[in-house]
Amino acid sequence: MSFATADLCDAHEDQLALGTLRVLEPVFHLFSRAGCFSGEAVTLKVFEDNALVRATLEEKGAGRVLVVDGGGSQRCALVGGNLAQIAQQNGWAGIVLNGCVRDTLELNEVNVGIAALATCPRRGQKLGTGERGVAVQLPGALVRPGEWIYADSDGVLVASAALK
């Protein structure tokens, strides 16, 4: 599906006013060759630990978007080239990460959309801590499981339901 978040905002101003369509703060950068991505949100809340991220991406994605609240930490990466490959193999549409990525040259080779705050070469821990299926607070909006994510180079949108 090809779209522009700017056009979606223009077409759904009523939902913006109601709060059923929200815009994340402009702190996310795209780190893959996918120009835009969208899908139903699967949420995780972790901190400097990517074991739950890996476990989730190893499941069938079915065109969904993994939304990870990494607490905004920029001390380590939660997603890198290996996890991006796993996400692509399992049919995930994208990843929105309130945290860092690494292996950016490898990320540029995958067709999974990846939006994150920044890069960091250090890997995250693998302790298995965190929560799945909870509402997560990202910069600018709360994201609930089952809501819809739309992302491109202009920004990231969160919609209560799929946009037509």
Curated annotation (Swiss-Prot):
Keywords: Lyase, Metal-binding
Tree of life domain: Bacteria
Residues that bind a divalent metal cation: D103
Residue ranges that the Swiss-Prot or TrEMBL entry lists as coiled coil: none
Cofactor note: Divalent metal cation.
The keyword Coiled coil is assigned to this record: no
GO MF, any single term: oxaloacetate decarboxylase activity
Secretion signal, residue range per the UniProt entry: none
Presence of keyword Lyase: yes
Reaction equation(s) it catalyzes: 4-hydroxy-4-methyl-2-oxoglutarate = 2 pyruvate; oxaloacetate + H(+) = pyruvate + CO2
One GO-annotated biological process of the protein: regulation of RNA metabolic process
Residues that bind substrate: G80, G81, N82, L83, R102
EC number of the protein: 4.1.3.17, 4.1.1.112
EC category name: lyase
Cofactor: a divalent metal cation
SUPFAM superfamilies for the chain: RraA-like
Functional description taken from the UniProt entry: Catalyzes the aldol cleavage of 4-hydroxy-4-methyl-2-oxoglutarate (HMG) into 2 molecules of pyruvate. Also contains a secondary oxaloacetate (OAA) decarboxylase activity due to the common pyruvate enolate transition state formed following C-C bond cleavage in the retro-aldol and decarboxylation reactions.
Subunit structure: Homotrimer.
UniProt family annotation: Belongs to the class II aldolase/RraA-like family.
Name listed for the protein in its UniProt record: Putative 4-hydroxy-4-methyl-2-oxoglutarate aldolase
